[in-house]
Every structure is written in C-alpha cells, then in structure tokens.
Amino acid sequence: MTRPSPVLATVARLPASAAVLVAAAALLVTPPAPAQESPQPSRADWLREARLGLFVHVLPASPSDLAKIDDFDVEALAAQVEAAGARYLVLTLGQNSGFFNAPNAAYDRRTGYRPGERCSRRDLPLALHGPLARRGLRLMLYLPCQAPNEDARAQEAFGLARGPRDQPIDARFARLWAEVIGEWSARYGDKVAGWWFDGGYARVRFDEEIAGIYAEAARRGNPAALVTFNPGVMLVRHTRAEDYTAGELNEPFSVVPSSRWVDGAQWHALTFLGSRWGARDTRYPVERWQEWLGKVVAGGGAVTLDVGPNWDEKAGPIGSLAEAQVAQLRALGAEGR
C-alpha cells in the first residue's frame, strides 16, 4: 500500500473548506514529475558518461576465416580505439554464418560440432579485454537473438525451422539459446560491460518473455551488464528488460535526444561511419558527424559507430582499423569529450 504524503494526511484531518484551500496550495507548490524517468542509479550511467564507442563486425564465414582469429592483433585494435577517443568497444561474437569468435561448449554439445570446428579455439573477447582494460576501455558483445540462419544443422539442433532467414522463436528455444549466452557470460564475468542483441523482431515473435530469459543469461556473470534488443532500424525502448536503446540508424543526423531517457532507457544510437556496415571508408565529412555528436551529447545520449576491421594480412594487422576512419574518429573523440 502506498503511504500517503504529509500534505494529503493533513488535508484528511481538516474541515472541508480548509481542505480545499490546502489542496489548491499543494497544486501550486508541488513540481510536476519529469516526463521520462529512470531508476537511479542506472546501470547505464557509465554509458552516458562514455558518450562515444566503436563497434566492429568480426564475422568469419569459413574455416579459413576462423583461423584468422588466431592472428587478430588485439593490441593494435585497442590502441586505435584509445586514439579515437572512444570509451568502449562492441565486438561481435558471431552472426549468421555459424562461426563464432570464442569457444562455447554448450553450443558444441547442442550442435554436435567439434571444439574449434565452428567456435574458435582462441577466445577473442578474453584476448581483447586485457589490452582494452589497461587503457581504461570497456568491452561489450554482440549476438543475434537466434541460432545462425545460414547453418541448417544449428537451426535444427536448436529446434528451429531450416532455411537462410530468421525463423520464428519462442520461450522453449530461448531457454536453449540462453545456455549458450550464459556460458559466455559466466566465463567473462565483469570483463563484459554489456550486450547488444540483434534480431529482436516482431516478425520472429520476439517478446518480453524471451527478452527476460536472455537478459538473465547475459547477467549470469555480471549483474551490472547492460542489455538491449534490436527491433529494427529505429530508436525506441523495445522491452522492459533493456537498459539502453539498441538505436540502429542508417541516416542518423535527424535523430537527436530530447532527453537522456527513452521511456526509462538510456538514449543510444548505433550507426556506421563508412558507406555500409563493416566498411572501411568514410561517407560524410567529419564536420557533419561533429555537429550531430555534439547535439546527442548535449541531450544526454551516447553514440556507437561501426568501423571496419582489416582481414587482409597484406594490408596491415588483422583486426586493425583504416587510417581514414581513425582520423575522423580522433576529431569525433575530441567532440565527444
């Protein structure tokens, strides 16, 4: 039961005429409640303070690609993230191909793959954490909301329909997928500051129950970990379970925060610096990015920019970023600070 306020308790003891006067006075002096509130303190406070982060799509699509995870230069990438002025890095664990950047025994047991066959033997998130942490930078992880849609064997093993597209999911599937999520979360503990889950679409029947199952698994190792679930190209609070908005945007410049909060979730946008996701070029002059980032930061938001890691050993260290992108990011990092 809600405890009555002191003003209301006093009114209840007064004659009717006096009660009316007191109640009217209370309306004049009581400030209006904020339009959008969030629990304080919020798990997402550090994200607001970070302002700018980077995202890298590391998506091996074959055994030869997976072998390159052994050569991924984590020191080079961490140094570039720091030089860019970003405060965190989001790394993909995997996506559609069925190849993943870290070992996972739960996944291997469910699918029947041998260790190292689909999940790399090198634990890339663990390898990245050290160089990032020494620089005061945080690590976050990306994972789809369902088994890889280009691996029919995995789809069948998790009880999904086979086919190269996102399949309908339910709570039964979510509990199986949560075993995979939970193994990674338990291993990494507080080394992972948050999760960005892709494919939380209405068309695959993603719902609050599934979001809750995934959020619990993602926080198995770190109760303070942030989670969000991507509903598509939009910036909204999609579920009650999320701490910040997924905020996927293709053309971001017209989208700015009017408040730090979106229905109680931290305002956050994710878009790409290059011409497309994972590209290594630049698509806009740095001044346009500076203007937008300045507005976002002033409004209490945070921005994650996707950049392209190198996969050609002849072009430089595996996993390193293009100098053209790093140059833009240095200017943006200064703006974010």
Residue map of PLM features:
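N-terminal secretory signal peptides that target proteins for export/translocation
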Residues: M1-A12
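Bacterial N-terminal signal peptides
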Residues: P15-T30
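Sec/Tat signal peptide C-region and signal peptidase I cleavage site
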Residues: P31-A35
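Mature catalytic domains of secreted/periplasmic carbohydrate-active enzymes
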Residues: Q36-R337
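Serine/proline-rich low-complexity intrinsically disordered segments, especially terminal tails, linkers
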Residues: V7, S17-A19, Q40
